[in-house]
Amino acid sequence: MTIRSTRHRCMTALFSLALGMAATMMPPSRLWAQEDASPAGFDAYMQLLAARARGEGVSEATIQAMTTGLTYNARVIQLDRSQPGASTTTTPPAYAPYRIKHVDAARIARGRAVYGNVAGDAGRIEARYGVPLPILLAIWGAETDYGAAKGGFDLAGSLATLAYEGRRRELFAAEFIALLKMVDRGVPKDRLKGSWAGAFGNPQFLPSVYLRIAQDGDGDGFADIWTSRVDTLSSIGAYFRDAGWKPGVPWGVPASVPDGFNRAGVASRLDSPVCPRVHARMSQWKTVAEWRALGVNAEGNIRDSELTTLIEPDGAGKPAFLLTGNYRVILDYNCSNYYALSVGLLANEIAR
C-alpha cells in the first residue's frame, strides 16, 4: 500500500495549542491516523511521541537525548515501500535457490566455529531453555550471519520515520517508545544501530522484544545481544521457549512421498488468522504413523506418535518434509516457510 504525499498545513499558533491539548488526550496513532506524511510535519509529530513517552514514564533526559536533532529519513521509507507485496501469481518462487544461498558452506562453517566457541555453555543454555543450540545458532546465522551484518541505521530515526509515515503507525510508535525505555534501562545510545525496519543486535530483536525477552546469560548485569555470544543465544532461547518450543522434538524431518499420492485428500482446510499464505502450503496434521499408512515415510529420528504436517516447497515430486509444532515456533520468529526450512536445515548441518 502506498500513501499519497501532501504538504501539511502551516502550523499556526492556534493549531499548536490544539496539538498540545490533543497530545494529552489521545495517542499519536489516533490523532494522525488520517494524515498524509511529508517531512514538513515530522517535528510536530515528534512532539506527540515525546508526550506519549512521558505519559509512559520515560525520563525527560532520555526523551531529550533521543529526540533532539532527530530528522525524517526518506531512505527508510524508500526501502519500506520497495518491499515486495502480495504476489498476484499463484505459483511461489522456487525454494531451491533460496536454500542454496542461505544454507551454504560458508554459513555452515561459521556456525560450527561459533558452536565450538560456546561449547562450554551449550549444556546450560539448552537445559534452561529446552532448545538445541544448533537451532539457536541457525537463527543467529540467518538473521545477521553470526553478527557480521547487524545493520547501520540509526534506530531512533528509522522507527520515528516509520511511525510518522503512518501505514503501521501504532506498531512503530510503540517500538520507538520501547527504544527510549531501553535507554532508560541503561542500554548505551551508541548500541542503537540496526536495520532500517528497527531490528538490531545479533538476533535482530525489535525494542519491545528486547525489553520482554533479552537475557543476561553470562551474568554480567547487562543483556548484551550485540557482542555477547552467551547473551545472544540465551535471548533467542528465551524467545523460542516462550513461543512454545517442545524439548526433545525435531523441527521436522525429510520425507518421501509416493508417486500418485493424493495430495488433495490431505490438504489443510484451516484458514490461519496469521500468515495464511504460509500456512496454506502445509497439509492437515497427522501422526508420523498415519503418514506412513498413506505411503509417506519420515526419513529421520522422530516418534511415530508425533503430529506433523507435510510440505513440498517446490511442488510434487520435489523434496518434502514432515514438520512438527516446533517448526511453527520458527515461523513465529519469521513467518516465511523458506526462512523456517532454511533455519532447520542449517541447524542440521551445524549439528553434524
Enumerate the predicted regions with their spans.
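Acidic, glycine-anchored loop motifs typical of Ca2+
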Residues: G217-I225
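Bacterial N-terminal signal peptides
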Residues: T12-M26
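Short, functionally critical alpha-helical segments immediately adjacent to catalytic or ligand/cofactor-binding
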Residues: A53, T62-Y72, G130-G147, L179-M182, ...
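Secretory-pathway/luminal and periplasmic proteins that interact with or process carbohydrate-rich
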Residues: Y72-L79, T144-F153, E165-R169, R185-R191, ...
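C-terminal soluble interaction/assembly domains
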Residues: P258-R352
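Substrate-binding/active-site groove segments that recognize
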Residues: D154-A163, F176, F200-Q215, I236
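N-terminal secretory signal peptides that target proteins for export/translocation
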Residues: M1-H8
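An acidic, Gly/Ser/Thr/Pro-rich helix-cap/linker signature
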Residues: Q34-E126
